[in-house]
Amino acid sequence: MSIELDWTGLEKSFADSLCERLNAALADMDMPTFLGPTRVQAIELGSEGPDVQVIHIGHVWREFREAAVHASSASDKYNARATTPPRMPMRLRTFRQYDDNDLPTSVHGGADADSIASEHEESLSRWSDTESETGTCDSSSLWEEQTRLSDIPSLQMHLSVQWLTSTMRLSLTTSLKIAYNNDTIMSLPISLVVTGMELFAQAIVALDGVHRCVYLSLSEDSTEECAPDGLRAVHDARIRTRHQGQRILPFLALESKVGESAKHVLENVGKVERFVGDMLRQWLEDELVYPHFYTLYL
């Protein structure tokens, strides 16, 4: 089922709000040590809207619900010993990446690619077992009762999103820090403008009425028939965990300026633009491609 978007009817206030949210996310993000503060300066959505189709509607995945329960439990433990309550996190990772003693925003590091791949394969095998009562899409009686009592419905939608645009503009600024013996000896200002892109993704949007939040994640898109769990199995699980950022965002057009405008400026530096594109694709894999996801609280 296709969704018609009045893309050109979106007001500037929507783009400004999106800009603020992106800057809030960037402020909380762990950036590479060689990059200075990064900020989105402006967003223009352009005249070419994405093609969006609903391909699946079902129950909220158990992984999402368990992550919310675990985050709530960790937050309660923190509140019991804190004088002021912590700010509700903008982002959550999957349940299995938490430690019982961590706060909701704590994420384990150091896991190698093989362990991540094995976890993903195990998760994919659970999704394919549609006859199992303990599969990802199961609904416990307690969950069903809580859902009925909530004034917000609980459901999960999978959307096929294809966005080919050359009219959008996203301007951001950052700096390249050059260090010697752990001391920054030089900082080069960098201005970047995204002038076009091709995005092919399956957006996973889960509305959780019990915990009053929305889970957002991405997966690869495909023309293959949708599986009962909502994901389109287009690749072997061992391949699916690698280079997804490149397949989701195969094309990204950038314009760059390196240096201070009052002094010498280098424009359209190819190596910088390729590096930024690779870093953005890696960010997609590390932050948004399932099993990673964002949680927005209502």
Curated annotation (Swiss-Prot):
A GO cellular-component term linked to this record: ERMES complex
Membrane topology, record value: Peripheral membrane protein
CDD domains the UniProt entry points to: SMP_Mdm12 (cd21672)
Residue segments, region Disordered: 118-142
InterPro entries xrefs: Mdm12, SMP_LBD
Highest taxon listed in the record's lineage: Eukaryota
Residues annotated as domain SMP-LTD: 1-298
Compartments, record wording: Mitochondrion outer membrane; Endoplasmic reticulum membrane
Family from the record: Belongs to the MDM12 family.
Protein name: Mitochondrial distribution and morphology protein 12
Gene source species: Malassezia globosa (strain ATCC MYA-4612 / CBS 7966) (Dandruff-associated fungus)
Gene name linked to the record: MDM12
